[in-house]
């Protein structure tokens, strides 16, 4: 909205509508929730991140700090008998998955590699079943978080942009938003434990907010197509 105002558009009477992902056809939404050997599955979303978009020279140190925090969190998950399913949002994130696994091995020495699931996702159609197979999602990419919510998954968002914080707030999950620029493994673990503990209470809230967003988009489509 601020950008539109800046280039001369009048936006005072314009309504802001939810992301179009909320209107995904029901046929695309899988309803699968499998546990690996009875263990709970955590969808862990990774992304290439080297600092705020406004920073002219991205920092490798910033990226490594982000990655090392994820590795420490993953080490805690493995120590507490969780299965980790890596999630990506762009093709370029596959290199992050590889580096993550390398750092995890360096950190832990040996671990049960069957408890780290890393499958390619080259499309939304491939990504959706991967998210559906998780019990809880901890993710960085906006659309990993958004798709998890559409699938009614309790989420911790590692927020790299104000749009992530806004989404979590709109979904009633503001307390489960973790600022990527101030990552703290201990606090991330606490947020994860809280979201897991409250998962059954959160799911109806998420479902209701998603349905509200879907109805808002229906309204938007009606307004658009009536004017054509």
Regions found by a protein language model. Give the residues of each.
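Active-site anion-handling motifs in enzyme catalytic cores
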Residues: 1-228
């Amino acid at each position: 909205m601020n950008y539109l105002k800046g280039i001369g558009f009048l936006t005072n009477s314009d309504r802001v509508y939810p992301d179009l992902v909320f209107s995904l056809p029901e046929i695309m939404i899988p309803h699968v929730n499998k546990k690996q050997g009875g263990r709970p599955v955590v969808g862990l979303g990774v992304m290439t991140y080297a600092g705020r978009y406004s920073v002219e020279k991205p920092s490798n140190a910033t990226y490594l700090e982000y990655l090392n925090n994820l590795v420490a969190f993953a080490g805690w998950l493995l120590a507490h008998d969780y299965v980790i399913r890596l999630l990506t949002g762009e093709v370029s994130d596959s290199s992050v998955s590889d580096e993550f696994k390398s750092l995890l091995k360096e950190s832990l020495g040996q671990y049960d590699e069957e408890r780290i699931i890393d499958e390619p996702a080259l499309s939304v159609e491939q990504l959706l079943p991967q998210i559906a197979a998780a019990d809880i999602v901890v993710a960085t990419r906006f659309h990993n978080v958004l798709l998890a919510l559409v699938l009614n998954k309790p989420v911790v968002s590692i927020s790299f942009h104000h749009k992530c914080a806004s989404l979590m707030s709109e979904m009633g999950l503001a307390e489960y938003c973790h600022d990527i620029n101030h990552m703290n493994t201990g606090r991330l673990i606490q947020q994860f434990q809280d979201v897991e503990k409250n998962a059954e209470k959160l799911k109806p809230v998420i479902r209701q907010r998603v349905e509200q967003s879907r109805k808002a988009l229906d309204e938007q489509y009606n307004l658009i197509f009536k004017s054509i």
